């Protein structure tokens, strides 16, 4: 009350000589007659200081001007008046912003379009302004339908308090980009994990789980066919104990092998195939009539070699084929003469051309 009494005494004299101390150094010294507006401002300042605690009096005086400028720059009140059959000339849109710090969302209604030469454009409404108050009613937490009903019930005169929504609009754009980046990161992470699993399968040779290796096995089986050894049904049969059964198997092997000699296969695949056949062949030759079957097999092999020596055999095939019958005698041949003869065989080169055309 002492400050108010001092101000009243000085205002009654018509002059104000007030010099601020170090705490109020930002305020200039006022001299001369005061107007009614100045007296009103001084009275408001005195009332504000009198109601605040002592520790916050200086802080309130220091920030009073900045708060006033901030509120004036962020908030504005616009009055829009339209004709009876006319429109206000603006469109609104409601956004729901997700708060990252707390599990809540904020709803704000902002102007998305303003028509030129409309009452809203003439009143000063801009795109991006956010509704804070409509006809004295706060729109905080209102849905889009509630805001529309409030505007329609106002009649021809509409008083809107708006906020500058540039930062909020920018925040909404950044939130949308953040969600897009999160989804992209999730997809890339799944792709990275799948590539890592494929790499581990290829490095450790896990053919059961690797699709590439499964396709390779299927292609290999389709290419080589019967050359990979006896079928599982053949392995399930009882052991060969008679001469006729062993001869029939050898004859079928000779006929099938003559048809398949033209196929170009790798040396490792042939060796692996005949290594699986060796166990079955050994079981056949250790039967009760082993010596007689061995002589018949050697004579049949010599006849098949003499018949097909004109072009179906190759040195690699003969060496692998004779490895099945390890005890059979082999004829010595000159390698150089055979290589020259194989150059003129058309059937051998035709198989190679067919294999290249598949790829």
Swiss-Prot record:
<dbReference type="GO" id="GO:0005829">
    <property type="term" value="C:cytosol"/>
</dbReference>
<dbReference type="GO" id="GO:0005938">
    <property type="term" value="C:cell cortex"/>
</dbReference>
<dbReference type="InterPro" id="IPR052122">
    <property type="entry name" value="Intracell_Traff_Signaling_Reg"/>
</dbReference>
<dbReference type="GO" id="GO:0030155">
    <property type="term" value="P:regulation of cell adhesion"/>
</dbReference>
<dbReference type="GO" id="GO:0005769">
    <property type="term" value="C:early endosome"/>
</dbReference>
<dbReference type="InterPro" id="IPR036034">
    <property type="entry name" value="PDZ_sf"/>
</dbReference>
<keyword id="KW-0967">Endosome</keyword>
<keyword id="KW-0963">Cytoplasm</keyword>
<keyword id="KW-0175">Coiled coil</keyword>
<feature type="domain" description="PDZ">
    <location>
        <begin position="77"/>
        <end position="166"/>
    </location>
</feature>
<protein>
    <recommendedName>
        <fullName>Cytohesin-interacting protein</fullName>
    </recommendedName>
</protein>
<dbReference type="GO" id="GO:0005737">
    <property type="term" value="C:cytoplasm"/>
</dbReference>
<feature type="coiled-coil region">
    <location>
        <begin position="165"/>
        <end position="188"/>
    </location>
</feature>
<dbReference type="InterPro" id="IPR001478">
    <property type="entry name" value="PDZ"/>
</dbReference>
<feature type="region of interest" description="Interaction with CYTH1">
    <location>
        <begin position="166"/>
        <end position="188"/>
    </location>
</feature>
<dbReference type="Pfam" id="PF00595">
    <property type="entry name" value="PDZ"/>
</dbReference>
<comment type="subunit">
    <text>Interacts with CYTH1 and SNX27.</text>
</comment>
<dbReference type="GO" id="GO:0005654">
    <property type="term" value="C:nucleoplasm"/>
</dbReference>
<comment type="function">
    <text>By its binding to cytohesin-1 (CYTH1), it modifies activation of ARFs by CYTH1 and its precise function may be to sequester CYTH1 in the cytoplasm.</text>
</comment>
